[in-house]
């Protein structure tokens, strides 16, 4: 009986040894095949011309220059473009079919006629009260007016950035701004904003909390106001609430599907002086003021370059959504 058990054990050990030998032999054979294959590739590679799917960059020149891959999908074939312009443009052109004409011209740049939308606004002030940006890409034309420089800058800051806003109850509470990204934004037919900074005892600094006439006036009868005060200091506010709504807002970052185009003017609007605003000159540009036909021709010519500086976004903007989450 013991002899049978020894035979079984011996047979098992011999099987294990044979299996181990076979596996090692297979491993050596595979190594030989792989190394031989790699050697052949190394020898033949100088004589082969493989397809390079990268983008060729020049050895010399500025590496800051953007090189676009021409094989990428053309975004305008599946996107919508809104063009916002002042009503005076249509008045000067005086042609009932001018929008159809421009649509046909946009078609030559690859934009289907059904993807272009023209939106008129009366003036900067009225547009700032009720901005509506619904397209995948939005181009806002603003004619330069020396008397409205601040209004234009604030509107550009509003449109080119995303804001998270909450209501303010200025009758019950004091408010303070926590950092540079924190602003108070007011909208309405007439916004007059007065502030009174408070010390740690909630006493006015240079003003009386019980007398609004002693408050500092930071805006008078404006339709759009972006108020910036000293951070970390409580303020008592006085606002014309019957004609204006004020919100406590936080700047989240750039709204990359919007570009502002200044039409004419010797001075160029720039909102990048705000330390919370990243440089965005590519989405804020100027065209020379001639005639409105000339302005629109210029936009058609450069529309694709302008869109390349933008990003398609699905989030829309209107005055109601802006107050809470943009």
From Swiss-Prot:
| Gene3D superfamilies, sorted | Glycoprotein VP7, domain 1 (3.40.50.11130), Rotavirus outer-layer protein VP7, domain 2 (2.60.120.800)
- Please provide the record's keywords in A-Z order: Calcium, Capsid protein, Disulfide bond, Glycoprotein, Host endoplasmic reticulum, Host-virus interaction, Metal-binding, Outer capsid protein, Signal, T=13 icosahedral capsid protein, Virion
The keyword NADP is annotated on this UniProt entry: no
Pfam families, sorted: VP7
Q: Which residues are glycosylated?
A: 238
- State where Ca(2+) 2 binds: 177, 228-229, 231, 301
Q: Where is this region: GPR motif?
A: 253-255
InterPro entries from the UniProt entry: VP7, VP7_1, VP7_2
Q: Point out the signal peptide segment.
A: 1-50
- Cite the post-translational modification comment: N-glycosylated.
**Which residues are involved in binding Ca(2+) 1?**
95, 206, 214, 216
Localization per Swiss-Prot or TrEMBL: Virion; Host endoplasmic reticulum lumen
GO molecular function ontology, one term from the record: metal ion binding
What is the documented function of this protein?
A: Calcium-binding protein that interacts with rotavirus cell receptors once the initial attachment by VP4 has been achieved. Rotavirus attachment and entry into the host cell probably involves multiple sequential contacts between the outer capsid proteins VP4 and VP7, and the cell receptors. Following entry into the host cell, low intracellular or intravesicular Ca(2+) concentration probably causes the calcium-stabilized VP7 trimers to dissociate from the virion. This step is probably necessary for the membrane-disrupting entry step and the release of VP4, which is locked onto the virion by VP7.
Subunit description: Homotrimer; disulfide-linked. 2 Ca(2+) ions bound at each subunit interface in the trimer hold the trimer together. Interacts with the intermediate capsid protein VP6. Interacts with the outer capsid protein VP5*.
* Similarity remark: Belongs to the rotavirus VP7 family.
User: What protein name does the entry list?
Assistant: Outer capsid glycoprotein VP7
Species this protein is from: Rotavirus A (strain RVA/Human/Japan/YO/1977/G3P1A[8]) (RV-A)
Species lineage: Viruses, Riboviria, Orthornavirae, Duplornaviricota, Resentoviricetes
């Amino acid at each position: 009986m013991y002899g049978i058990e020894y035979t079984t054990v011996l047979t098992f050990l011999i099987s294990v040894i044979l299996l181990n030998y076979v596996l090692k032999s297979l491993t050596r054979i595979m190594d030989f095949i792989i190394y031989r294959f790699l050697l052949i590739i190394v020898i033949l590679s100088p004589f082969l011309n493989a397809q390079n799917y990268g983008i060729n960059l020049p050895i010399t020149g500025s590496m800051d220059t953007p090189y676009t891959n021409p094989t990428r999908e053309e975004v305008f074939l599946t996107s919508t473009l809104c063009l916002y312009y002042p009503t005076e443009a249509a008045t000067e052109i005086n042609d009932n079919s001018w929008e159809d004409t421009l649509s046909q011209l946009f078609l030559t740049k690859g934009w289907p006629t059904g993807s272009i939308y023209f939106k008129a606004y009366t003036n900067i002030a009225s547009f700032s009260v009720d901005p509506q940006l619904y397209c995948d890409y939005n181009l806002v034309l603003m004619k330069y007016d020396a008397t409205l420089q601040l209004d234009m800058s604030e509107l550009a800051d509003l449109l080119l950035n995303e804001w998270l806003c909450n209501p303010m109850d200025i009758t019950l509470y004091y408010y303070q701004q926590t950092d540079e990204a924190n602003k108070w934004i007011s909208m309405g037919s007439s916004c007059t904003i007065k502030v009174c900074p408070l010390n740690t005892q909630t006493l006015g600094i240079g003003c009386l909390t019980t007398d609004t006439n002693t408050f500092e006036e930071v805006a008078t009868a404006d339709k759009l106001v972006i108020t910036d005060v000293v951070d970390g200091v409580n303020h008592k506010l006085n606002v014309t609430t019957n004609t204006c709504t004020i919100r406590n807002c936080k700047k989240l970052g750039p709204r990359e599907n919007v570009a502002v185009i200044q039409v004419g003017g010797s001075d160029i609007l720039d909102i990048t002086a705000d330390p919370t605003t990243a440089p965005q000159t590519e989405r804020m540009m100027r065209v020379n003021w001639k005639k409105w036909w000339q302005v629109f021709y210029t936009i058609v010519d450069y529309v694709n370059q302008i869109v390349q500086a933008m990003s398609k976004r699905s989030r829309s903007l209107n005055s109601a959504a802006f107050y809470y989450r943009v």
